[in-house]
């Protein structure tokens, strides 16, 4: 297929790059992880002809990348398919790099802001708190946008900083970009707590390990785990945030 090229030269760093040169307005990429989880992305029409970046967040093994063009209504036709054998350099790789949902470059406003906040931080945990408070203080929840947002929405951290408003996904994307830009492995996780749709941010702190759900969105409000609990990473503190573990399901990690 001449319209599609896939760059698999960075799979050890936990991402692939795909370029679509066609003219169809709705194109979807499905990435199937080694455990069978299917991630569906909508390509950004503004990026046709250049590469977009997508995470490989399902650990080592064989991934499948399938590209579909919209034919009519909600029907899609497969135009490109490739399998990839992935061996990550380490478990942190997919959570350190930019991707379609957490985009930044060295010139991004988010990276410059991250550097400034980092310079004022005592350590990584302090920096996580600085990021949380910066975003909560400077971004206002956009209720109208939340009610009208279309599926396939792609957040843009710099645009969120410029507008000062955003929906849940915008907050999560900006926080994740700020954290990753300062080399803190960060998972943007989406899933369910009981019936409710949730977003979480989990970070890896060198002194502690992975701290799950250090920042959480419950569908209404953002909250930050008590830093002293985060530092000890005690099971009871995590339980307090997610309730009974059996009700808590991470569906996707970006």
Report each predicted region and the residues it spans:
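N-terminal accessory/pre-domain segments preceding catalytic cores
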Residues: 1-123, 211, 245-254
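N-terminal start-of-chain detector that recognizes signal peptides
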Residues: 2-3, 37, 158-159, 171-176
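Short N-terminal helix-initiation segments at or just after the protein's N-terminus
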Residues: 6-8, 144-149, 168-169
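Generic detector of short, locally flexible boundary/turn motifs and exposed helical patches
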Residues: 30-32, 151-154, 164-170
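Secondary-structure boundary elements
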Residues: 98-163, 211, 219-220, 225-231, ...
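Active-site nucleophilic cysteine motif
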Residues: 127-131, 164-179
């Amino acid at each position: 297929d001449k319209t599609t090229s896939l760059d698999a030269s960075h799979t050890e760093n936990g991402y692939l790059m795909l370029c679509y040169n066609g003219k169809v307005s709705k194109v979807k990429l499905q990435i199937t992880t080694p455990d069978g989880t299917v991630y569906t992305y909508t390509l950004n029409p503004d990026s046709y002809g250049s590469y977009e970046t997508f995470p490989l967040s399902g650990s080592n093994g064989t991934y499948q990348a399938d590209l579909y063009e919209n034919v009519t209504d909600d029907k899609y036709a497969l135009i490109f398919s490739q399998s990839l054998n992935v061996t990550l350099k380490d478990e942190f790789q997919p959570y350190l790099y930019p991707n379609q949902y957490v985009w930044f470059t060295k010139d991004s406003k988010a990276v410059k802001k991250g550097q400034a906040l980092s310079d004022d931080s005592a350590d990584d945990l302090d920096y996580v708190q600085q990021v949380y408070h910066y975003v909560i203080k400077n971004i206002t929840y956009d209720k109208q946008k939340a009610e009208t947002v279309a599926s396939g929405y792609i957040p843009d951290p710099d645009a969120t900083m410029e507008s000062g408003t955003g929906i849940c996904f915008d907050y999560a994307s900006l926080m994740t970009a700020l954290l990753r830009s300062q080399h803190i492995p960060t998972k943007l996780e989406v899933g369910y707590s009981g019936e409710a749709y949730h977003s979480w941010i989990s970070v890896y702190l060198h002194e502690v390990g992975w701290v799950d759900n250090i920042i959480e969105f419950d569908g209404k409000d953002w909250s930050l785990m008590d830093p002293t609990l985060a530092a000890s990473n005690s099971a009871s503190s995590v339980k307090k945030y997610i309730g009974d573990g059996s009700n808590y399901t991470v569906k996707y990690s970006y």
